[in-house]
């Protein structure tokens, strides 16, 4: 009887991909980026091993939201002090903190736990079209849709 192949952490080969977020819908972008970070696009995918690739997201400030989400969607955070609840709309987030907007969407689609945190470290988000990772020779990744 054959056994299923299980990748080992030291056998994983990592590539670098560049994803352009300009004009893309936030959730659709985040789900594909999360799949790349997990390594689900590889035939050697193993659920309990971090076999994903590095992903660079550029033009984070040009990401789109559908419907009235720019004004209606709220981002919450709390300082853990009494009265420390902070609320921002999606428009404020896209204007001032577009990197955090994409990071929060992708983080929610990764596994919860130490493996998910390890995968999240391979995400690099930048506001403009420039990034400091030219030395890694990243490939351009075209999103489906």
Swiss-Prot record:
Keywords: Ribonucleoprotein, Ribosomal protein
InterPro entries linked: Ribosomal_uL13 (IPR005822), Ribosomal_uL13_bac-type (IPR005823), Ribosomal_uL13_CS (IPR023563), Ribosomal_uL13_sf (IPR036899)
Name of the protein this chain belongs to: Large ribosomal subunit protein uL13
GO BP terms, alphabetized: negative regulation of translation; translation
Organism: Geobacillus thermodenitrificans (strain NG80-2)
Domain of life: Bacteria
Function in brief: This protein is one of the early assembly proteins of the 50S ribosomal subunit, although it is not seen to bind rRNA by itself. It is important during the early stages of 50S assembly.
UniProt keyword 4Fe-4S present: no
GO molecular function: mRNA binding; structural constituent of ribosome
Span of the signal peptide: none
Gene Ontology CC entries for this record: cytosolic large ribosomal subunit
Entry's family note: Belongs to the universal ribosomal protein uL13 family.
